[in-house]
Amino acid sequence: MAARKQSSQPSRTPVSYEDVAVSFTQEEWEYLTSTQKTLYQKVMSETFKNLTFVGSKKKPQEPSSDLQDKNEEQEKSSSCTGVFKGGPFFFCLTCGKCFKKNTFLFNHQFPVRSRRLAVTNPQSRKGKGYKAQHRGERPFFCNFCGKTYRDASGLSRHRRAHLGYRPRSCPECGKCFRDQSEVNRHLKVHQNKPAASNQAGNQASNQRLKSRVPPTTPRSQAPALKYVKVIQGPVARAKARNSGASTLNVRSNSITVVRSREKISCPYCHITFTMRTCLLTHLKIHFRRQPNQHFCCKESAHSSNTLRMQKIYTCPVCDSSFRGKESLLDHLCCQRPIRFSKCWEILGHLLGYLHEPVVLGNIFKVRDSSGKRMESRRRRRKRACTENPETEGLSGKGRVAPWEMEGATSPESPVTEEDSD
């Protein structure tokens, strides 16, 4: 009877996740769309959860050594994208790799470089500057224009531009946008608009600003409202440029800056400019008095810097030009108070400061009408010291010795040699 009961009951064999799971190769996984990949991941995760819930009541049996070797060979041969072994249910949306825990998936998508590991073990992989695995990879591309994106959300947001689909709208003005982030960015424009009470108070100051702005053509004013940019930043305190208005308190976290293509026209001619500085430079042409005019040659320069760069100081001897007086004096004096240059000596002879004549830059000594040679100041002083030592107290380079005085005799007294020329 026991044998009949055993034969009547069907044989129960354990079912593993590998028997139920459906795997794809790398080529098959690339042909799947994003929606098919998402559906596949959801189905496989539910299947794995059901199997783990049923198998949790019984203690899992240890697999044999042959089964372990077979699983290891299959894991090595299978690629990381699309092939699921062992029942993971957390998937990477970029490459399709699967993980058992959510933390493993997070570490796979956002690997962090460990500073402690870099210090303790500089030869490790992370210590050498471990990069993210998906950095620079853009697997999702648009079929219309070919642009690539890192995730499916960016691709879906881009497709709305081709289809003209703008589901989000502004609650105040009704303008439509592609996503909520653009709506939130657009709402800051409405928040920075002044109230009705402030508009009446600022009307006078706005008229002052308009009066100072040069006249523009109405054609150039038309596209000014199309270029609006919002600059986010801390609370700022701004002041109107070139106006007598008081400072403007900006109490919001963003400042609206209107980009305009207005061209400022010259009031004296029909030339237009995009920058006020260019207009001010151009207005110097219409002035009666020429700006940056040199006091000597009466020539006007484009700017004061150009006037400063001119070499207006020239040497009267060698015709060398310099920018300042200091450079000219350094040239004449050779930057030394004792050693004078040839130009300074020639100029001194021409002006009468030096007694020795100079011809063509060569200094030479000549004799006067009586036939005597002209002595220099140093030579005359030395001769006067040797002739009258009592008054001067000096003889040559040193002090006068007692035996050198008048009336003294000494065998070792020095003999002064007079110049015999």
Swiss-Prot record:
GO terms for cellular component: heterochromatin; nucleus. The keyword Mitochondrion does not apply. InterPro entries: KRAB, KRAB_dom_sf, Znf_C2H2_sf, Znf_C2H2_type. Gene3D superfamilies: 6.10.140.140, Classic Zinc Finger. Residues 195-207 have a biased composition (Low complexity). A zinc finger (C2H2-type) spans 90-113, 140-162, 168-190, 264-286, 313-332. Keywords: Developmental protein, DNA-binding, Metal-binding, Nucleus, Repeat, Repressor, Transcription, Transcription regulation, Zinc, Zinc-finger. Induction: Up-regulated by LIF. Down-regulated during differentiation of embryonic stem cells, or during retinoic acid-induced differentiation of F9 cells (at protein level). Regulated by JMJD1A, which mediates histone H3K9Me2 demethylation at its promoter, thereby activating expression. GO terms for biological process: autosome genomic imprinting; epigenetic programing of female pronucleus; epigenetic programming in the zygotic pronuclei; genomic imprinting; negative regulation of gene expression via chromosomal CpG island methylation; negative regulation of transcription by RNA polymerase II. Expressed in oocytes and in a subset of adult tissues. Expressed at high levels in testis, and at low levels in cerebellum. Present in sciatic nerve and spinal cord (at protein level). Belongs to the krueppel C2H2-type zinc-finger protein family. Residues 191-221, 371-421 are annotated as: Disordered. It comes from Mus musculus. CDD domains: KRAB_A-box (cd07765). SMART domains: KRAB (SM00349), ZnF_C2H2 (SM00355). Disruption phenotype: Affects the maintenance of DNA methylation imprints. The absence of just the zygotic function causes partial neonatal lethality, whereas eliminating both the maternal and zygotic functions results in a highly penetrant embryonic lethality. In oocytes, its absence results in failure to establish maternal methylation imprints at the Snrpn imprinted region. Intriguingly, methylation imprints are reacquired specifically at the maternally derived Snrpn imprinted region when the zygotic Zfp57 is present in embryos. Pfam families: KRAB (PF01352), zf-C2H2 (PF00096). It is found in: Nucleus. This is Zinc finger protein 57. The record marks 178 as: Crucial for 5-methylcytosine recognition. The KRAB domain is required for function as transcriptional repressor. Zinc fingers 2 and 3 mediate recognition of the target element, ZF2 interacting with the 5' half (TGC) and ZF3 interacting with the 3' half (CGC). Residues 15-88 form the KRAB domain. GO terms for molecular function: chromatin binding; DNA binding; double-stranded methylated DNA binding; zinc ion binding. It comes from the Eukaryota.
